């Protein structure tokens, strides 16, 4: 998914090479990747093209949310090894799992401040409440969301592209303390 000209867009690519071109062209505007584990690369079906693509994307954009999907449950191990989420296409909860991933990582819905362990600590439904949350929640939550670009993705989903781009370009590790990030 990426945002251009005021709205988020979904780009569907037929092969590895086209996906790579899209990332090179739109990389700073992409809010996340959902990919099959297996898809065409160099003209033939490649059983690990999605994993290779995810690794390549992460080498350029380390905090990019990535979900790999497959009918083969054993591919979960490869996804886990590269820090990607995994979606089993034969799961009874497929649609709910996909929805949860998109809402949690691409900025749709309310902004839920969480700790790294997933514990929910505050919910913001608008920018005013987001600012209040940033002022009040634990530093650990701010660092977690800052490292993962959750703030910029959430703002981009609300057409706040200038602010989202400015936040995305910041690296929380460049600050002396968590309070400086706040």
What are these regions (language model features)?
Residues 110-144, 179-182:
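Membrane-interacting alpha-helical segments
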Residues 20-21, 38-63:
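Short amphipathic alpha-helix used as the core "switch/output" element in two-component signaling
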Residues 6-15, 43-46, 67-112, 116-119:
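Output/docking surface of receiver
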Residues 2-32, 42:
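Acidic, metal-coordinating helix/loop segments flanking the phosphotransfer/catalytic sites
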Residues 141-173:
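Amphipathic alpha-helical packing elements
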Residues 170-182:
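Charge-dense polyanion-binding interfaces
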Residues 33-37:
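Active-site T/S-Asp motif of two-component receiver
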Residues 29-31, 60-65:
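His-Asp phosphorelay/catalytic-motif detector in bacterial-type signaling
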């Amino acid at each position: 998914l990426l945002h251009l000209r005021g709205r988020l867009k979904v780009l569907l690519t037929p092969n590895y090479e086209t996906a790579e071109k899209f990332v090179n062209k739109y990389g700073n505007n992409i809010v996340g990747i959902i990919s099959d584990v297996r898809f065409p690369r160099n003209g033939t079906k490649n059983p690990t093209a999605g994993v290779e693509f995810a690794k390549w994307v992460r080498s350029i954009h380390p905090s990019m949310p990535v979900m790999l999907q497959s009918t083969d449950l054993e591919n979960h191990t490869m996804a886990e090894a590269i820090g990607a989420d995994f979606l089993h296409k034969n799961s009874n909860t497929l649609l709910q799992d996909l929805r949860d991933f998109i809402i949690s990582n691409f900025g749709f819905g309310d902004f839920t401040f969480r700790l790294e362990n997933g514990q929910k600590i505050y919910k913001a439904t608008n920018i005013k409440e987001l600012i209040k949350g940033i002022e009040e929640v634990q530093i650990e939550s701010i660092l977690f969301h800052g490292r993962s670009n959750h703030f910029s993705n959430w703002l981009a989903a609300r057409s706040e592209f200038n602010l989202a781009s400015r936040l995305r370009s910041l690296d929380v590790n460049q600050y002396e303390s968590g309070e400086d990030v706040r």
